[in-house]
Amino acid sequence: MTQTRATQRGGNDSVSAVVVDDSQFMRTVIVDMLEDAGIDVLGTASNGADGVETVLESDPDVVTMDLKMPGVDGIEAVDRIMAERPTPVLVLSAHAADGAELTFEAMEKGAVDFFEKPSGEVSVGLKQQRESLVSTVRSVANADVSATEAAAERTRGDAAGGVSAGATPASTEYPDRPTLLVGASTGGPTVVEGILEALPVEADFRVLVVQHMPDGFTGRFAKRLDDASEYSVREAEDGDRIGGGEAIVARGGSHLEVSGYGGGRLRVSLTDDEPVNNVR
């Protein structure tokens, strides 16, 4: 029976962390925020190599990982951690375009989720997001890394072999243009990518993807899904219409609603209504 870290802690809500960031100022801010919330910070590191060593020595429940660091960067550090001692990793990502690309590379290596660093005055921005950061750290700490990675590898392997996970032969009869809804939060991007890779083309799905992710990242996420899948994938726009063989990704910071149907195509709307369960 696979155990999450919460189960391994005997149901104890206490969480331990290691903070890796090349900025001493950022390390101090993050450590203070986590410790103020009752999270036990076992150690810090200013580069990827020291970060890996600290994780191996202290065996934390979660690691917060900067990406751009001298020497061993965050992507290589995530790769080493997952190879030597699989541990849930939360990437702290910059909003810039290259930051988004690096973030997805880190998630390919096994990072569970990411948290967007605020732009502008870093200390002010982070403190305003204290509650969200702490909540994300706790959620990532409880992720079952082995199960998530195994599922992603299975779907990738099946797709590469031409048979999707749980797929039926090509001769199977599907409903006319069925609609598939995919919703995900912590740890979702890698799994969602595996699902899109494995979807049978002959099913001609209309796919709606809602992945909790900041605006500015969902467009690049859609591009990655488009590259990985035989379906045509794009970021949703207000009033978009979607037919069979197409997939859309809800824009970060917006709700995605199905507002109409005609000629085999769905019409969707984007709204900025109040968050539901603290997300939008």
Feature locations, PLM:
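Conserved acid/base catalytic micro-environments in cytosolic active-site loops
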Residues: 2-6, 11, 16, 24-32, ...
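Hydrophobic "anchor" residues on beta-strands that sit immediately upstream
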Residues: 17-18, 62
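Conserved acidic carboxylate
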Residues: 21
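Short hydrophobic/Thr-rich beta-strand motif most characteristic of the beta2 strand and flanking loop
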Residues: 38-46, 54
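Active-site beta3 strand of CheY-like receiver
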Residues: 58-64
